[in-house]
Amino acid sequence: MFEEVQVLIVGAGAAGIAAACRLLEQGLENVTVFEAGDRIGGRVHTVEFADNVIELGAEYVHGERGNISHELASRHNLLEGSKILTKNENWIFADSQGEIIPREQSTELLNIYHGIYAVMPNKLTDFEGSFGEYFTQEYFKAFKENPFTNFTRAEEFLEWIRRYECIIDSCDSWSEVCASGLAEYWICPGNPLLNWKGRGYKTLFEVLMNKFTPEANELPLLEKVHFKKVVSSIDYSSENQIIIKTTDNLERNADHVIFTPSLGVLKEQHNNLFTPPLSELKKRTIQGLGFGTVDKIIFEFPYKWWPEDVAGFNVVWSKEDKTKFLQSLDKGNEWLAEVFHFSTVDHQPRVLSGWLTGPCAKHVENLADSIVLDGFYDILQRFFSKNFNIPKPINMIRSKWNQDKNFRGSYSLRTLESKKLDVWAKDLAEPIINPTGKPVISLLYRYHLIVISKNETNHFLQILLFGGEATNEHYYSTVHGAVESGIREADRLIDYYRKRKSQL
C-alpha cells in the first residue's frame, strides 16, 4: 500500500517524531525527517546535570485522562506524581524585607488561586477582556469573601500571581491573553505534575519507538532523521510533487510533507518559506496567535540547604521596596526585579530551578552566565538569607528559547489580537484555491495546516500538513498536544491510502 509513497517530515520535535513513528509502525518505510538542529526532541530537551538529568524544556506530563503522553507512558509504569510540588503548604514565600510570610497566608493564597482555576472553564467563554482582567476581578471577589491577609499584602500576592501566570501562558503580559480564547484550552483531569522517575522527558520518544515494548520491533526512527537540515523552501505549486530545499543546497521531492516547526519559526519565516504564499487569512492567523518565551535557569548547589518538605521559594515585593531596588540598580539590571520563583526538581536533591518570561527572559538570554548566576543568587540572599544559610551555586545551566533560530520562543497562546483579527483554530479548516481552481490548501479544523494538490494522472493527493502544539485547538502549549497532532496527521495519510486501496 505504501511502497512508493514518499513522506518528508520537517522537524524532529514531539509532533514530528510521533508522526514518523506512526507511519513506520503502519508500514510506510519511505519516511525522511529533516531536523534543523543536532538532536531529536525539539522543545523537549533533557540534559545531564548535577546528580541526574534536568529539563531545559517541557518537564511534566500534565494530567492523566485525555493525555496521550500519559496513555503511552502508563503502559510501562514510567510516571509518578511529584512528592511535594502539588502541596500548597510546601511553598515558602518571603517578603522584600527578608521575612518569611506565615504559611497559613501563602497556603490560603494558593488555595484561592487553584479555586479560581477550578471554576474558570465555565466563566471564561463570554468574558470580553483579557485574562489579567478576569483573574484580577475574580481574585478580589475571593479576597472580599475571605480576607486572609491585609489588602496591601493581597495586592503584593496578586503581583506574584501575575508573574506566575506569564509563565503558564508564555506571554509578555497577562493583559495580552484573551480570556475567551483561553477557554479553548482543555485541562486533562488527574495529577498535573507527573515526572519520568528520573529518566527525563526524552523517555517519551523511546516509548514511541517501541523501546519499552518487547513484543514489538523497535522502530528505526533515528535512521530516518537527517540532522542540521534547515529547510529554506517548500514549493507545492507543481501538480506532481512537493519540492523541498535546504540551506545546504539539498533538494528533495515528496508526495507528502508534514511541517512541525514552532509557531515562532512560522511567524519569522512563512513569507519566504512557501510557494505559493499562504493566504491572507492564514497569515493573519499566524500573526494573531501568540508565541512567547519562558526560560529556565537551573542551579546546582554544593549541598541541599532547604528542608525536605520545601517545594520551592517565592519572592513577594512591596511597591516601596521594589521602587528603591530598581533605583539602586545599574541600567540593564532591571530584570532582577522580575525574579520571583525557585522550584525544587524531582530526583535532583541539590538543584533549584528559576524562571523568567517575556521581554525579561529575552534580555537575560544575552547576558553572560556569571552575571545571571550572581543576579539570581543575590535575590535568593536578599529574600531568604535571614532564615537559611545559602551557599553559592557551583554550576548553572539555562535555556535560550527565543535566541534559538529553530524555535524563537517556547509555546503558543491565544491573544486579544487573535480575537480582534477573528482568527482561531477553526480557520485552519478553510481551503485555499490555486489559480487553476483546484483545491491546493485547506486547514484541518482544530489541528493542522494542510496543503493539497491533486495529481490528475495518478489520482492521489499531495498533502503538506502543519503539526505541533500551536496547531492543537484544545491542548496547545503541551507535549501531549504536539504528540497528538503528529499521530493524527500520520493517521490522515494512512486512512487515505487504505481507502484508496479499497477502491482499487
Where do the protein language model's features map onto the residues?
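FAD-dinucleotide binding site
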Residues: 1-504
